[in-house]
């Protein structure tokens, strides 16, 4: 018998370079009733079909709601005394630092309230979940008992698992350096963090 789907579930999706029709078909294939946009900058120069000025109207035509939750957006700056030095990528380290703030907690609570009402999909730009800050949001949901899955194709979703080097105390997550080295060895090569070059200003992710 197929495994029953958890009653409390959040889906995630990256719009990437998909056409609007492709994106909508993905949402419909997974019964999404509301998109929660977690981009800090809700527009795309190369894919304007996903701009905040037009996407809500397009989704409304097919019965899908839209909410922009900027309080969960990326582009956060790391602190000089960061507890999250396990992330060598400055963008992820900055977001992990932001996860320790009341603003993040309040926005996450809004997300959970939306998930209690609708079948939601967190949306950002990056197609690959583990290259996007929505994977950290999924960590925060997971430690609160909320099952999260990443939409990959119309017929497949990927269950989110906690970041290997995360340290959890209650609902607080940090990513300390001492946990990172051993965790890296357990990951497949394709998911290991690259060694940063001396100039770390270049942002390798399209996640905003």
List each language-model region with its residue ranges:
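Residues lining hydrophobic/aromatic ligand-binding pockets adjacent to catalytic sites
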Residues: 1-208
